[in-house]
Amino acid sequence: MAALSKSIPHNCYEIGHTWNPSCRVSFLQITWGALEESLRIYAPLYLIAAVLRKRKLEYYLYKLLPEILQSASFLTANGALYITFFCVLRKILGKFYSWTPGFGAALPASYVAILIERKSRRGLLTIYMANLATETLFRMGVARGTITTLRNGEVLLFCITAAMYMFFFRCKDGLKGFTFSALRFIVGKEEIPTHSYSPETAYAKVEQKREKHRGTTRAMSLIALVRSLVDSICKHGPRHRCCKHYEDNCISYCIKGFIRMFSVGYLIQCCLRIPSAFRHLFTEPSRLLSLFYNKENFQLGAFLGSFVSIYKGTSCFLRWIRNLDDELHAIVAGFLAGVSMMFYKSTTISMYLASKLVETMYFKGIEAGKVPYFPQADTIIYSISTAICFHAAVMEVQNLRPSYWKFLLRLTKGRFALMNRKALDVFGTGASREFHNFIPRLDPRYTVVTPELPIDFS
């Protein structure tokens, strides 16, 4: 409580908009910079999404631009209103407390801003910011010594999350929408209890392929011969009667799953590195080759490939041991498959999936009538989460995710780094630690406290 009541007499110019003594001019500068960056983010994002979703011409003519402008307005408002409430709170309270420069100013700004955004996007934004805020609070706790880090904690969290996700995936109506489609793509439809193929139809398809094969035997090339040999090996092997991978035995089923998802992971990481590689194409041509043999490409491939193969292998093993197919197998298989994150450790992925799992379970509780529904829950959670992240950006940026800090710098054209954090060190959070004792040059005519580096007018 003593830390909360501690205050400093500096005004908003001395702490916040140190580049200009005028609150109005600073507001306009932040607004313009945020709007420019917001349009740069959302214009290509919405355009690519429209192309991938195969939108009709009417969407491009009447809906695309309004949606871009609405999302850009939301993001712009979040930045512009923050500096507004920053100045307003200082004028109302007459001084700065430890909570006002960050959390206090960002909370109302975030609440008003999220109301501008479309309702269909609020849930996704809330999940992202809640995940980021949780990670930030965890880092704050570790920095203060109140939380002890657990070795490979992100892997353990992913194991638990994967176990629950795979259980819901196996249950009837357990998952819906994109999450169900994504898991079906990753592990395959053979692991769904309501598998659309019956043994008869599966074998019928195999027979049809064999008939076509006999008709083209003479024209069969060496590649086709090898493929035929591999197919025959895959089909003639141990497969439990409860297993639904009718065209593969259990061993080839796991191997194929690994190869498929390893390729997907490798290609995804390659695609993510393409923009940076082509940016240095003429200055550093060797970077183009590193696009293909980069370590992270193989790490993501190994992560996805081993996740699928371990999950499928464990599921098959449990069917052999118990002589039945049970949804509970997915809990064990999912947990063991989660160990694959050792190849590609990521706190961000673990936290995001855990947040999505909590959201899924919350809505399932609402459907079952066991959990109350809060109409403004997403708005409130977003506001609090964003306020926590802004507070960290002001008071202890060392505990904020680096990618989000870079985003805030882009949104404000670097002005977020110009705050007088040296004056905020009195609150004991090490606000200036990452800024190499940066002290802004201030006009003494507009300051309350004599500045350390006054502007020289001589």
Curated annotation (Swiss-Prot):
Pfam families linked to this entry: Tim17, TMEM135_C_rich
Domain of life: Eukaryota
Coiled coil: none
GO molecular function: lipid transporter activity
Membrane topology listed for this record: Multi-pass membrane protein
Subcellular compartments: Mitochondrion membrane; Peroxisome membrane
Keywords, ordered alphabetically: Membrane, Mitochondrion, Peroxisome, Transmembrane, Transmembrane helix
GO-annotated cellular components: lipid droplet; mitochondrial membrane; mitochondrion; peroxisomal membrane; peroxisome
InterPro entries given in the database record: Tmem135 (IPR026749), TMEM135_N (IPR031926)
Transmembrane residue ranges: 68-88, 96-116, 149-169, 298-318, 331-351, 377-397
A GO biological process held by the record: response to cold
Chief subcellular location: mitochondrion
Summary of the function given for this chain in its UniProt record: Involved in mitochondrial metabolism by regulating the balance between mitochondrial fusion and fission. May act as a regulator of mitochondrial fission that promotes DNM1L-dependent fission through activation of DNM1L. May be involved in peroxisome organization.
Family: Belongs to the TMEM135 family.
Protein's name in the database: Transmembrane protein 135
Organism this protein belongs to: Rattus norvegicus
